[in-house]
Amino acid sequence: MNKNIIVVGANQTGLVFAAFAKTAGFDVTVYEAKKQCDVAYDWTDDMVEETFEEVGMPLPPKEIYTRKRNWTFVPPEKGVNVLMDLPDDQLDMAIYRRPFNAWLLSRAECAGVKVFYETPVKRAIVENDVVLGVELENGEVVPAGLVVDCGGVISAVRKSLPESLKITRNIDKNDTFIVRRTFFNRPENTARPKYTNRAYLKHINERGISWCTLSHDEKQADVLIGRVGEMSDKTYENALADIRRDNEIVGDKIVTGGQLLQIPVRHPLSRFVANGYALLGDSACMTIPMLGSGMASGMKAGKMLSDVLSSPVTENPFSVENLYRYQARFMKEIGGKHAAVDMMKNWLLNSKKGDVDFLLGKGVVSRKVLIEASAGHMIVMSPAEMAQAAVKGIKKLPLLLNLAVLLQKMKKECKTASNMPKYYDEAAFSKWEEKYEKPFRK
C-alpha cells in the first residue's frame, strides 16, 4: 500500500495535519502554490486558547499572540452598542498569522514533512473513483495513497473531481463573503475610542458585516468590510466612508492589507471524503458561518483526520470506509453546531429592515447569544431566558415567534448534522446528506 500523503496547501490547517500525520508514521509532502512569505496574511485572527490543548499542541511562543479585546456589536441603524464585556481570562487569543504559520512550518519540518513552495497543484488524478495522486501545474504527476485538500474555498483540486464522487465541486458565491481587510494609520491626536472593537451587523442594511478595531499597538485601525456573494468598489467605498464617520481613528493612509479575499461562510460540505481523498479546513467549509474564522476548527479537524488514519477500521486507512469516520467525528463535535449557526446567519441577513435593531436594542437577542453564535456554538435558551425575551419583544410578537421557530429548527438541524450513520454505507450516507441539506435549499 502507498503510504504517501500529499497535502495541498501550506496554510495553518495543512501544516498542523502534516506534522501529526508524519509523526504517526506516514510519508507526507506539502505542495503550496504561493511563495513562503505570502502564504499567511499579515494580521491577527482569533482562537480560543483551549484549542491547543484539545489537539495536543503546546501554546505558540508568546510573541506570536496577544489577547483580543471585547467585541461591541452594532446593528444597522446604530441605535445601540452591545459590548460583550467578557473578563480578560475569557478573551480569545489574537494570533499573528504570518509568524504563527512560520512556527507551524518549523514543527512540520522538524517532524520530517517535506514542503515545496511555488508549486501549484493543477488537478487530482482519479481512476475508478479512487484518487491516486495529483498533477502539478508543471505537468508532473505525483502518486499518493491519500490527497488531503487544504486548497481553500476555490480549491482547484476539488473542482477537478469527477461528479461520480458526489463531492460539491464549486461553492455557491452566496455561501461566501467577499472581504477586504485593510490597516489604516491612526491620525495623531485622535482620542482612544470607548469601543475599541466594533462589529457592524448588516452594515448600512446590506448583506454582510464590517468591523473597525484599534490595533494592539494602538497605532492603526483594522477595517474589514465583507459582503455576501459580491462587493463592488462603490459598495466598499460607501461602507468605508460610513466607518470613517463613526471612527475617527481610521486615517487615509494604508499601512498593510487591502487584498480582496473570498471566505466560505456556510455549513460544512455534506460530503468531504472519498477513496484516497479528504477535504480539510476552508476547502470543506469548516469556518464559523457568522464571521468566517476557521483556524481553530481546521486545526481540530486536522487532528481528527490524523487520529482516524492512525487507527483504521479497514486494511486500507485511505479507504472511504475509514475516512468516513473522520467526517462523522467532525460533524458530531463541530459541524452540527456550525450548521445551526449558518441558519441563524441566513435568518439575520434576510431579516427586514429594523428587525436586527429591535432585537439588539431591546435585548431580545442577548450578549450570550451573540457570543455563542460568533464562536460557532449551538444557541440554547432556557425557558426563563425565552420568557424574558418574550417580555422584551412583545411589541413585535410576529418577529419573536419567528425567532422561536428558528431556534427550534436550529436545534433539529444540529441533531441531524451531528448524527451521521455510524458506519459507511453509501445509501445511508446519501439519505443523511439529503436530510442535512434540506433546510439550506434556496
Residue ranges and their predicted role:
Residues 310-442:
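C-terminal helical "tail/cap" subdomain of flavin- and related membrane-associated enzymes
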Residues 6-10, 20-41:
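Glycine-rich FAD pyrophosphate-binding loop
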Residues 86-106, 228-235:
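Short beta-strand to alpha-helix junction loop
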Residues 107-249:
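Predominantly flavin-linked oxidoreductase catalytic cores and closely associated redox partners
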Residues 35-75:
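N-terminal FAD cofactor-binding segment of flavoenzymes
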Residues 141, 231-314, 318-327, 331-332:
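FAD/FMN-dependent oxidoreductases across multiple families
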Residues 14-15:
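N-terminal Rossmann-fold NAD(P) dinucleotide-binding loop
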Residues 1-5:
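Extreme N-terminal starter segment of soluble prokaryotic enzymes
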